[in-house]
Amino acid sequence: MYSLGERRVEIKAKDYFIAENATVIGSVIVNNNVSIWFNAVIRGDNEPIEIGENTNIQDGVVVHTDEGIPMQIGQGVTIGHLAMLHGCTIGDNSLVGINAVILNNARVGENCIVGANSLIPEGKEIPDGSLVLGTPGKVIRKVTDEEIKNLKLSAEHYVHNFKRFKEGLKRIEQLKDMQQKKIIGED
């Protein structure tokens, strides 16, 4: 984690997980049970970024803002691997699929699914309870009650998963140590 001038990361959480190689810079607010996974970059260098409780930001995600366009990620949100979020708002209990892109001033409502590889252009409003697919993203249909249940389960899974990682993740320091402990065999 890094400060940038007066912009500082604010941890409002009793419990959270930020992977060692994730980068969190500037005005970023991390709430309870947030997990920020490996190689994610959260850059609050221009405007604040707030990440709601029980939200997970998966491996390789980039979150950034432009001046005058702060960012809000709601509670219980799942941001899939390699997604790109830029100056947008994501409602509670939504999922942004793998490699999706959401641009400045776009608003994704609550209980939404933005499919993998979808693009939500600048200023686009996605109503609550929508399934969005494509480039540019289009509302295909309303999400089902079963899908809403699964959105909640996804967020809960990542809360349990980060606790497992906090407890059990250990760095393997040197190859020599690995060989001595017979974790790997010699050639």
List PLM regions with ranges.
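Glycine-rich hexapeptide-repeat left-handed beta-helix
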Residues: M1-A13, D45, E53, D59-G60, ...
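A positional/architectural concept
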Residues: I11-T65
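Short, Lys/Arg-rich nucleic-acid/phosphate-binding segment
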Residues: G68
